[in-house]
């Protein structure tokens, strides 16, 4: 598993129910573009605002709709046994892997985090990608990642939404001890850098609305066209300004999708709120800049 994996937004109707027609359109759009993986129940997908049964339903529908790409399901929770049930469910529906964020809300020691992931790995026989996002959840120390990778063969990699090259570099050292361990960035702006360091790809939110730039970076890198890859990486860094403008990942990405004319409503589940017209106009300027740039390069 490698390349460009998309942590999907969860489209909602005005009444906050899941819009499965929009989900179907979105997955078809992404697969037609050629992304390597589809990931439901993600941070960008507002998984914390979904009920337990909705998480299962969304996972099932995503599996049904994904036919070309790898299919990943987020199964994270603050409850270890709920994680086990969701992870077993992901296996039962035929997911290729699960992505499990470290427990959030309560601060945990490294020993507790190690035990949490170990219990899940022992009881759920499916490939597991750890998910480190210290801005939202307990951080996962690199030594804990190393121990988990060496002790559990079904823990196959990590998604690191961590703004630190040092952390990424230390994760890549785990690959030296376990060659098949995968390291993905969760931050669009680190995608090219991680590839140059020996990483395996990215699980990145901007790929919801601009997958072509991520795929062009991936292809240029694989073809050793590094000058082109660097140019594209700089464009991607500029696009990520939407995160600073908006109040949440989901708001930023959904407004960018609306700006591009996608059939996605600008609706977030409470307690999240969609940003207003001023923020939307700023995001639209960034999206239109990228579209104009692409036309000029054709």
Swiss-Prot record:
Q: Which domain of life is it from?
A: Archaea
- Pfam families recorded: DHDPS
Q: Give GO MF terms, alphabetically.
A: 2-dehydro-3-deoxy-phosphogluconate aldolase activity; 4-hydroxy-tetrahydrodipicolinate synthase activity
Q: Where in the cell is it found?
A: Cytoplasm
EC? 4.-.-.-
Write out the entry's keywords from A to Z.
Answer: Cytoplasm, Lyase, Schiff base
Main subcellular location: cytoplasm
Annotated InterPro entries: Aldolase_TIM (IPR013785), DapA-like (IPR002220), Schiff_base-form_aldolases_AS (IPR020625)
Set out the biological process GO terms recorded for this chain's protein: small molecule metabolic process
One GO cellular component assignment for this chain's record is: cytoplasm
Residues folding into a coiled coil are none
Q: Which SMART domains does the entry mention?
A: DHDPS (SM01130)
Catalytic center at which residues?
A: 43 (charge relay system), 105 (charge relay system), 131 (proton donor), 159 (schiff-base intermediate with substrate)
- Spell out the subunit comment: Homotetramer.
- PANTHER family cross-referenced by the UniProt entry: 4-HYDROXY-2-OXOGLUTARATE ALDOLASE, MITOCHONDRIAL, DIHYDRODIPICOLINATE SYNTHASE
What family is reported? Answer: Belongs to the DapA family.
Put simply, this protein is called Uncharacterized DapA-like lyase PF0657
Please name the source species.
Pyrococcus furiosus (strain ATCC 43587 / DSM 3638 / JCM 8422 / Vc1)
> Which gene is transcribed and translated to give this protein?
dapAL
């Amino acid at each position: 598993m490698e390349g460009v994996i998309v942590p999907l937004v969860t489209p909602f109707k005005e009444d906050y129910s899941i819009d499965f027609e929009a989900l179907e359109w979105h997955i078809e759009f992404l697969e037609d573009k050629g992304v390597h993986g589809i990931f439901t129940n993600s941070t960008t997908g507002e998984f914390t605002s979904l009920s337990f049964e909705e998480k299962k339903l969304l996972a099932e529908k995503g599996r049904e709709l994904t036919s070309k790409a790898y299919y990943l399901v987020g199964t994270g929770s603050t409850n270890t046994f709920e994680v086990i049930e969701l992870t077993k469910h992901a296996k039962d529906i035929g997911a290729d892997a699960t992505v499990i964020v470290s427990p959030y809300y309560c601060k945990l020691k490294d020993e507790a985090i190690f035990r949490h992931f170990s219990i899940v790995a022992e009881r759920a026989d499916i490939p597991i990608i750890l998910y480190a996002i210290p801005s939202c959840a307990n951080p996962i120390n690199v030594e804990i990642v190393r121990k988990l990778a060496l002790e559990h063969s079904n823990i196959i990699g990590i998604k690191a939404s961590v703004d630190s090259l040092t952390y990424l570099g230390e994760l890549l050292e785990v690959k030296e001890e376990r060659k098949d361990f995968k390291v993905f960035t969760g931050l669009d702006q680190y995608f090219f850098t991680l590839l140059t360091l020996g990483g395996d790809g990215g699980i990145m939110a901007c790929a919801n609305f601009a997958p072509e730039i991520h795929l062009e970076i991936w292809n240029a890198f694989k073809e050793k066209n590094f000058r082109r890859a660097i140019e594209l990486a700089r464009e991607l860094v500029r696009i990520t300004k939407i995160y600073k403008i908006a109040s949440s990942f989901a708001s930023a990405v959904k407004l960018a999708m609306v700006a591009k004319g996608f059939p996605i409503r600008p609706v977030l589940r409470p307690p999240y709120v969609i940003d207003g017209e001023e923020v939307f106009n700023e995001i639209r300027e960034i999206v239109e800049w990228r579209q104009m740039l692409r036309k000029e390069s054709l």
